[in-house]
Amino acid sequence: MLLCLLYFTSSWCSGSDVPDVCTNSGMIAINFVDGPVRGVTDRILNTLDELGVKATFSFTVNQKAVGNVGQLYRRAVEEGHNVALRVDPSMDEGYQCLSQDALENNVDREIDTIDGLSGTEIRYAAVPICNGQVNSEMYNILTERGVLPVGYTFCPYDYDDPVGEFESMIEGSDPKHHSFIILMHDGQEADTSRLENMVKIGKDKGYRFVNMDECLQGYKGAPGDPELSLRGKGVESIGKGFLPFFLMMLVRLL
């Protein structure tokens, strides 16, 4: 229990709801976080191309000078994937020590940097998640800039048998009614067989693997929250709501 525990830091355990499923059923969106990783992220991109599926890469900007990975930011975009921002991991536990101005300046710098590296206006971010929520202060900073923090339905590293658990979840679902956002880490997928197996399981059940733009098309915010307006041109202004995963499963059981 594992890398995803990073996403359950106590200082983030109350705040604002974020989407953990897609706005429409029948989709699976994989969000690769904490890359790019030299020799791994490029292999993942090759595999996704061979499988004919799209995904999202929540890249950090502190990797840009490490291992000559700068070209991977643009490559991901050019191949039809979304590039998102993994907000500086060093702030996961120490953000409380920063002033509001310092937090905003740091986020602005990171957004400007990843925009330049990717050649696009990023619209999504990965920050620590706890019980489907992110810290309200960070949520407000990001959404005021047109960037949406994204949650997840399933993280394979939480289980001893990740592919088996994923298969059980998919087999117990219905593409006509369900969708999923999957959190994965570039650095844990050097052997792409797990990714390949998960894509096969999802496709065999009738799901499509999509980038975050398609997954969250028309998303305007959690019920009761102010309507969001995301930056860039990738999200259409269609008024659709979203139902958190646990509510979807409850409806299915009734």
From Swiss-Prot:
Q: Which Pfam families did the record assign?
A: Polysacc_deac_1 (PF01522)
Which CDD domains does the entry mention? CE4_NodB_like_6s_7s
Q: Which domain of life is it from?
A: Eukaryota
InterPro entries, from UniProt?
Glyco_hydro/deAcase_b/a-brl (IPR011330), NODB_dom (IPR002509), Polysacc_deacetylase_ArnD (IPR050248)
Name the cystine pairs: none
By its UniProt entry, which SUPFAM superfamilies does this protein fall under?
Glycoside hydrolase/deacetylase
The GO terms describing molecular function are: chitin deacetylase activity
**GO biological process terms, semicolon-separated:** carbohydrate metabolic process; fungal-type cell wall biogenesis
Gene3D superfamilies assigned: Glycoside hydrolase/deacetylase
Q: Where is the NodB homology domain?
A: 26-210
**PANTHER family cross-referenced by the UniProt entry:** GLYCOSYL TRANSFERASE-RELATED, POLYSACCHARIDE DEACETYLASE YHEN-RELATED
* Stated name of the protein: Polysaccharide deacetylase domain-containing protein ECU11_0510
Q: What does the organism's lineage look like at the top?
A: Eukaryota, Fungi, Fungi incertae sedis, Microsporidia, Unikaryonidae
